[in-house]
Design a protein with these regions (language model features):
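Residue-identity detector for glycine
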Residues: 2-5
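ABC ATP-binding cassette signature C-motif
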Residues: 8, 12-219
Length: 220
């Protein structure tokens, strides 16, 4: 049960929408001016209720792949899904930093539903009063919790979560780990092997210019 001001908000378990698929077919990409393909004729299908870890050596295309999903680069082949991709962490404009956190959220996500965000914050062991503090006064951990709460309050989205536990203290890392463990519908990039082992059920492995999908966590 979460609270907002002096009112109680019943935080029922929020179920994600019915499973859909993401189809990647014949994906080929190289940066302009380069003769080496980062990805070459990559094809796979994943379900949108999977909890995927994206694994590969540094500089081998993890960020590039996320940007391709977000539509930031032109590529050959196709990426098809009925879902919309959202990225963590989302950028906050410098001029918005002094505003209340709720105003920052409204700028980024005008159609937000306050009760959903409050419920997600409750799962992250964070009081909703944080929404009425200046965003610039929030710690890195508090900002991480707010961003996750906003993203997981959205419908019809598949989340691309990039290094959510960077710069967090141990207690906050454990809260985020516990939170993500009960969620689904995301690709997680992290150097934290414990986080990957606890929170994912499938793996996207970058090998040379291919992407291989396997069931299991990081260690398996």
């Amino acid at each position: 049960m979460g609270t907002y001001g002096s009112f109680f908000i019943p935080c029922l378990r929020l179920e994600r929408d019915k499973m859909a698929q993401i189809y990647v077919s014949g994906l080929t990409f190289c940066y302009e001016g380069s003769y080496e393909n980062i990805f070459e004729n990559v094809s796979f299908c994943i379900d949108t209720d999977w909890k995927l870890g994206l694994i590969g050596r540094n500089g081998k295309g993890k960020t590039t792949f996320l940007n391709l999903l977000l539509g930031k680069y032109e590529y050959q082949g196709s990426i098809r899904t009925t879902e919309h991709f959202e990225y963590f962490p989302f950028p906050v404009e410098k001029e918005m930093m002094k505003n209340f956190t709720i105003d920052v959220i409204e700028k980024i996500y005008p159609d937000y539903e306050l009760w959903k965000i409050c419920c997600e914050l409750d799962l992250l062991q964070t009081d909703a009063e944080i929404l009425y503090r200046s965003y610039e006064t929030l710690s890195h951990g508090e900002r991480t919790k707010v961003m996750l709460a906003v993203l997981f309050s959205k419908d019809h989205v598949f989340l691309l979560i990039d290094e959510p536990t960077n710069h967090l203290d141990r207690a906050t890392r454990e809260i985020v780990e516990k939170y993500l463990k009960r969620k689904k519908g995301f690709i997680l990039v992290s150097h934290d092997r414990t986080l990957l082992d606890q929170c994912i059920d499938h793996v996207l492995v970058l090998e040379r210019n291919q992407i291989r999908v396997s069931q299991g966590n990081f260690s398996s």
